[in-house]
Amino acid sequence: DGENFVNNTDRFSYFNQLIISRKVTDAFSVQVSPSWSHFNAVEGYVNEDGDIEGKMNNDHFAIAFGGRYKVSNQMAIIVNYDQPLTKHTTNNPEPNISFGIEVSTSAHAFQIFAGNYYSIIPQLNNMYNQNDYREGQFLIGFNITRLWNF
């Protein structure tokens, strides 16, 4: 809806992440990933002085922890946890958590997992997730990746 944005650039958001990972053993890998999300426009409200303020900051910082344990050559258990670090005026996001299995064939990798976040875009998950995993608010996800062996 064009009425929500003054400029086209107000629609833009950005996500940056530094991925630090380590293959601990042949079967076990871990990852730590600090991230920064930026939204050019955030929802606002009018304060008691009549000024418009953002409900949330335009910038949001988070840190993610992930792990993968290979049960066999074709199957692995995967887990991920994203902890928001930025505190906003209202609507602070809930942490993202997911766990699942990965099955590989010679040409594809299939992942099926349960997580409490809803979007395919990571900056939306990190900044706006209101699903609380402690209350069982999980969704089911599925990924398929084509493996290329050149």
Q: Can you say where each PLM-predicted feature lies in the sequence?
A:
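Membrane-embedded beta-strand positions of outer-membrane beta-barrel proteins
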Residues: N16, V32, G67, V79, ...
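Active-site/pore-lining binding-face segments in mid-to-C-terminal subdomains
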Residues: A76, N80, P84, N91-S104, ...
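Surface-exposed extracellular loop regions of Gram-negative outer-membrane beta-barrel proteins
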Residues: I63-I78, Q83
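Repeated loop/turn-to-beta-strand initiation elements of outer-membrane beta-barrel proteins
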Residues: A27-V30, N73-V79, A107-Q111, W148-F150
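Residues that define the transmembrane beta-barrel architecture of outer-membrane proteins
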Residues: N8-Y14, N57-I63, P93-I97, S104-S106, ...
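Transmembrane beta-strands of outer-membrane beta-barrel pores
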Residues: D1, W36-N40, Y81-K87, T105-A107, ...
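Outer-membrane pore/translocation modules
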Residues: D1-N58, N125-E135
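Outer-membrane beta-barrel "beta-signal"
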Residues: F99-H108, I112, Y117-S119, E135-F150
